[in-house]
Curated annotation (Swiss-Prot):
<feature type="binding site">
    <location>
        <begin position="182"/>
        <end position="183"/>
    </location>
    <ligand>
        <name>substrate</name>
    </ligand>
</feature>
<feature type="active site" description="Proton donor/acceptor">
    <location>
        <position position="181"/>
    </location>
</feature>
<keyword id="KW-0413">Isomerase</keyword>
<dbReference type="GO" id="GO:0008360">
    <property type="term" value="P:regulation of cell shape"/>
</dbReference>
<dbReference type="GO" id="GO:0008881">
    <property type="term" value="F:glutamate racemase activity"/>
</dbReference>
<keyword id="KW-0573">Peptidoglycan synthesis</keyword>
<feature type="binding site">
    <location>
        <begin position="70"/>
        <end position="71"/>
    </location>
    <ligand>
        <name>substrate</name>
    </ligand>
</feature>
<comment type="pathway">
    <text>Cell wall biogenesis; peptidoglycan biosynthesis.</text>
</comment>
<dbReference type="InterPro" id="IPR004391">
    <property type="entry name" value="Glu_race"/>
</dbReference>
<comment type="function">
    <text>Provides the (R)-glutamate required for cell wall biosynthesis.</text>
</comment>
<dbReference type="GO" id="GO:0071555">
    <property type="term" value="P:cell wall organization"/>
</dbReference>
<dbReference type="InterPro" id="IPR001920">
    <property type="entry name" value="Asp/Glu_race"/>
</dbReference>
<feature type="binding site">
    <location>
        <begin position="5"/>
        <end position="6"/>
    </location>
    <ligand>
        <name>substrate</name>
    </ligand>
</feature>
<keyword id="KW-0133">Cell shape</keyword>
<keyword id="KW-0961">Cell wall biogenesis/degradation</keyword>
<dbReference type="InterPro" id="IPR015942">
    <property type="entry name" value="Asp/Glu/hydantoin_racemase"/>
</dbReference>
<dbReference type="InterPro" id="IPR033134">
    <property type="entry name" value="Asp/Glu_racemase_AS_2"/>
</dbReference>
Length: 262
């Protein structure tokens, strides 16, 4: 199984996969050279995704791909499925689930600008805005804050307040928030403290849904596990990567190495 993202957000998916499928082996591709995907063009996102899968597929016998990134999923998933002959799973903003949960009919969606602007997201926003008020924040800054948190940098309350100011100033805030980026679940506590100090809020991500799909695929198809160890690949060696290494110990990678994607 290959799981890839431009940052560590995808590790939240990997963590949940490990809970449900503890015996599975995996490759995690950290495309930190391209971080963040959220400020890249659709052309770049599509070409980069093809390059990652093609390059790793030539070296390792991967049989499932998990795109641990809302931006790539909303922009490129259909193209990737056409191009490769293995199951490919993506993660998407789960507005349908939010509609079932919201009490005040005000739903918040926070995602990267590329995810918000994608035709997929625009379509579902239009579909569900008929019966709900959907408040949107498109930002590439929150993923950067989450990455820094993983490396031990304190989360700036001032920066968070600036990002969420459009919602802070609302007479009634969303009671249900869709986390449209795998990084954002790392900041749930901080987001709640900024917006809802005395009230409850329900956060929605799509991790459970994609894990259910993966589990079903493994049960119902002839997908056999061919990778025999856990591998961590990265596209750029820098100081941020070095600070991340201690955090990676919990995932029990037996191989950590650079891979050239250029």
């Amino acid at each position: 199984m290959l799981i890839f993202d431009s940052g560590v957000g995808g590790l939240s998916i990997l963590k949940n996969i490990k809970k449900i499928l503890p015996n599975i082996h995996y490759i995690y591709m950290l495309d930190n050279e391209s971080f963040p995907y959220g400020n890249k063009t659709e052309f770049f996102i599509i070409q980069r995704s093809i390059k990652i899968i093609h390059t790793i597929k030539k070296i390792y016998p991967i049989n499932i791909v998990v795109i641990a990134c809302n931006t790539i999923s909303t922009v490129a998933l259909s193209i990737l499925r056409e191009k490769f002959d293995i199951p490919i799973f993506g993660i998407f903003p789960h507005i349908k689930a939010a509609e079932k949960i919201t009490k005040n009919k005000i739903i918040g969606l926070i995602a990267t600008k590329a995810t918000i602007n994608s035709s997929y997201t625009q379509k579902i926003i239009y579909e569900y805005s008929c019966s709900n008020t959907i408040k949107i924040i498109g930002t590439n800054k929150l993923a950067v804050i989450a990455e820094k948190k993983i490396r031990g940098v304190a989360v700036s309350q001032k920066k968070l307040k600036n990002i969420f100011r459009p919602w802070i100033n609302l007479p009634t805030c969303p009671d249900t928030i869709i986390l449209g980026c795998t990084h954002f679940s790392l900041l749930e506590k901080e987001i709640k403290n900024i917006l809802y100090k005395t009230r409850s809020v329900y956060f929605i991500d799509s991790i459970k849904k994609v894990i259910f799909q993966i589990k079903s695929c493994l049960k119902t198809s002839n997908v056999n596990q061919k990778i025999k160890k856990n591998i961590f690949l990265y596209s750029k060696n820098n100081n941020n990567l070095k600070k991340l290494l201690s955090f990676l110990k919990q995932y029990k990678f037996t191989v950590i190495k650079h891979i050239n994607l250029n």
